[in-house]
From Swiss-Prot:
PANTHER family: MITOCHONDRIAL RIBOSOME RECYCLING FACTOR PSEUDO 1, RIBOSOME RECYCLING FACTOR. Keywords: Cytoplasm, Protein biosynthesis. Transmembrane segments: none annotated. InterPro entries: Ribosome_recyc_fac, Ribosome_recyc_fac_dom, RRF_sf. This is Ribosome-recycling factor. GO terms for biological process: cytoplasmic translational termination. One of its GO terms (cellular component) is cytosol. Belongs to the RRF family. It holds the Pfam family RRF. The lineage of its organism: Bacteria, Pseudomonadati, Pseudomonadota, Alphaproteobacteria, Rhodobacterales. It comes from the Bacteria.
Length: 184
């Protein structure tokens, strides 16, 4: 292997890690019938003239396995927080008690569980596509480089190995999430 061409595999790995991090965020937004503070992460509240994450206007807690509470710091925002949760598409019916909003998490029926596993599969496929796009970028860099056939084969093997590792991580996370969703 000559010293002429060095592929930045750290950059490729960092970008593939980004796809995994994005997948985790998408998976966290899927309601599994189990209470989790992370399920409210995508909810944005119209507070003080700007769209603000819910955790910046109140404290999110999970006091029970099927209950999430939001203790809103500013009494004037309670209705806006309640509206944001109601309109978030999470299928949760908020109950207000002063500045505390209680979110009872209903059990999921079998049909909804199956729908959510399909959604999780779609998220995982999007992550696989993102990983493969990074792989293609790496392969394109190798093809554009003026390097020997042996060097090109070495780098292509390294990129493929990295890709396989990340695709397996996506598949493992999907399997775990689907088991979590289907668990009654």
């Amino acid at each position: 292997m000559s010293d002429d061409f060095m592929l930045d595999t750290d950059d490729l790995e960092r970008r593939m890690e980004g796809a995994i991090a994005s997948l985790r965020t998408e998976f966290a937004s899927l309601r599994t019938g189990r209470a989790s503070a992370s399920m409210l992460e995508p909810v944005m509240v119209d507070a003080y003239g700007a769209m603000t994450p819910i955790n910046q206007v109140g404290t999110v807690n999970v006091p029970e396995p099927r209950m999430v509470t939001v203790n809103v710091w500013d009494k004037g925002l309670v209705n806006k927080v309640e509206k944001a949760i109601r309109e978030s598409g999470l299928g949760i019916n908020p109950q207000m008690n002063g500045t505390i909003i209680m979110l009872p998490i209903p059990e999921l029926n079998e049909e909804r569980r199956r729908e959510l596993t399909k959604v999780a599969g779609t998220y995982a496929e999007n992550a696989r596509v993102a990983v493969r796009n990074v792989r293609r970028d790496g392969m394109d860099q190798i093809k554009k480089a003026d390097t020997s056939e042996d060097d090109a084969k070495f780098w292509e093997g390294a990129v493929q190995e990295l890709t396989d590792t990340f695709i397996k991580r996506v598949d493992d996370q999907l399997e775990t999430k689907q088991e979590e969703i289907m668990q009654v």
